[in-house]
Amino acid sequence: MDAQLTYTMGLLEQGYLSARVCSMGNSTSRLYSALAKTLSSSAAVSQELLEASQHDQSEPLDPKELLDECQVALQDRPARLHRDFFSLRSESSSQQPRTFRVMQWNILAQALGEGKDNFIMCPMEALKWEERKYLILEEILMYQPDVLCLQEVDHYFDTFQPILSRLGYQCTFLAKPWSPCLDVEHNNGPDGCALFFLQDRFQLVNSAKIRLSARTLKTNQVAIAETLQCCETGRQLCFAVTHLKARTGWERFRLAQGSDLLDNLESITQGATVPLIICGDFNADPTEEVYKRFASSSLNLNSAYKLLSEDGESEPPYTTWKIRTTGESCHTLDYIWYSQHALRVNAALGLPTEEQIGPNRLPSFNYPSDHLSLVCDFSFNEDPARLL
């Protein structure tokens, strides 16, 4: 308890945790406030009850009709960023493997976009939720992932869970214990990580919600890990989504969080017996120790987007590009890690060019987040020599 109090006071002193969160305006918002207090057992029960309610009998949505609806709502905005998929299969591959698609995306919490993040080159009109939600949904519907991993989700219960569940996804959400969204007036509740998978492609074997630790201290960052069984092959694999601590000066903290996540995943996957895909905004460029820790892990992980480079060893030049009051920020922070002994990357979605992004960077009228989505097509590796 003393260690927890010390950690909380440290966050208060550093300005990350406010001693006062904004009051909630209605019963739904008050429920979000309760969910943020994950140290309370009653709040944890409330979240579980809410997630259980996702199995309702609502009519399924047609993804094409919903995409059309999004595009009608966005007809006055510039066209979305054009991006192409690049095949990563070797020339010698004769058979077309059955693939599954994974999407990783920090969608930008609405409260942060309109409040704390200070995107000085992005008009406030471009950040309004009434239209921005259609841009986010359009991106998801265009790429139709089988597994979707999101960070900074603060509209889970009123937008993503009800819509995506009707599209056939099973949905899981874990809020940050002390979300910075709660410090923003008129917020929609805490942000957190969410994991969605299509139930006609996978079945849930088990699910773990993880509050990441830095050595012995519980932190404000979380992860979800779910072991799924492929409906077609019967093979199992584990998907994890996370969002590590942001900002310069917290490199050792991120390393501790990443190490804790790897320890948890090693236990869940029984020492990589079950193949693993980890999606996340790591808030760390490839020179950071937490990146090197994942790259050298005993779980035998590789970063999927390195395969787009000419040498197969270099990360993209950026996955986020924004302009704030503190200046321009262009970094690679987002990754899809995978078990390279058991899985193969068949294709990856390319990143837009600087010219496409434009001089005002992200977010913008034609892209809803300051982070770019990452999308990969995977297949199970059938080469027995690589499964050892």
UniProtKB/Swiss-Prot annotation:
It is found in: Cytoplasm; Nucleus; Cytoplasm, Perinuclear region; Mitochondrion. Mg(2+) binds at residue 152. One of its GO terms (molecular function) is 3'-5'-RNA exonuclease activity. Keywords: Biological rhythms, Cytoplasm, Hydrolase, Magnesium, Metal-binding, Mitochondrion, Nucleus, Repressor, Transit peptide. Its cofactor is Mg(2+). Its main location: cytoplasm. It catalyses: NADP(+) + H2O = phosphate + NAD(+); NADPH + H2O = phosphate + NADH. Substrate binds at residues 152, 176-178, 220, 243-246, 281-283, 371. Coiled coil: none annotated. Binds 2 magnesium ions, but the ions are only loosely bound to the protein. GO terms for biological process: circadian rhythm; NADP metabolic process. One of its GO terms (cellular component) is nucleus. CDD domains: Deadenylase_nocturnin. Expressed only in the photoreceptors of the retina. Expression is controlled by the retinal circadian clock. It holds the Pfam family Exo_endo_phos. Belongs to the CCR4/nocturin family. Phosphatase which catalyzes the conversion of NADP(+) to NAD(+) and of NADPH to NADH. Shows a small preference for NADPH over NADP(+). Component of the circadian clock or downstream effector of clock function. Exhibits a high amplitude circadian rhythm with maximal levels in early evening. In constant darkness or constant light, the amplitude of the rhythm decreases. PANTHER family: CARBON CATABOLITE REPRESSOR PROTEIN 4, NOCTURNIN. This is Nocturnin. It comes from Xenopus laevis.
